[in-house]
Amino acid sequence: MTEEPSRSATLEALKEAKRHGALISYDPNYRARLWENEKTAVASMQSVIPVVDVMKVSEEELLLLTEEPDYEKAALKILKQGPRIVAVTLGEKGAMIATQQHCETVKATPVEKIIDTTGAGDCFWGGFLSKYLKYGKGIEVLSWEEIMQCAVMGNSVAGLCVQKRGGIPSVPNKEELSDIWSA
């Protein structure tokens, strides 16, 4: 999304996938150094939101995309553009999950020692989405309780992630996940 022609090609591919019934998940993963400037980054990231079904943002990305310091109001601004669920990762405080009807913060999974937070947001989102997929139904029919369980799973996976060093090495393996996957 940082440069043309990949930016417009990606957006068209997302629109086509959406037309064919694909669930569109989006994590802007903003990295200032990759963009020409902040204005271009914001416009590009915002252009994707109307196509999205579920979206994960960090606190910084939420403020950047909405210019709204109140997280609940900011999430509602994004929800009005199309996504059914917005998850805001809050670091050691957990994650705020918002839909048009509900907004709640799910506390982070307690850990003995935080070693490195690199990749924690990605691990959260992977855990969230994997729990969603286990339900085997459309995002539009998930109950609030099921959405909350997705967030709990995401926090559990992120909790494992932060106890190791490095982005890729910290991603939990199948054995490490076996206890929480059965939940």
Map each language-model feature to its residues.
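Conserved beta-alpha-beta core of the PfkB/ribokinase-like small-molecule kinase fold
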Residues: M1-K77, P83-R84, K93-G94
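Conserved phosphate-binding/catalytic region of the ribokinase-like
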Residues: K15-E16, E67-A183
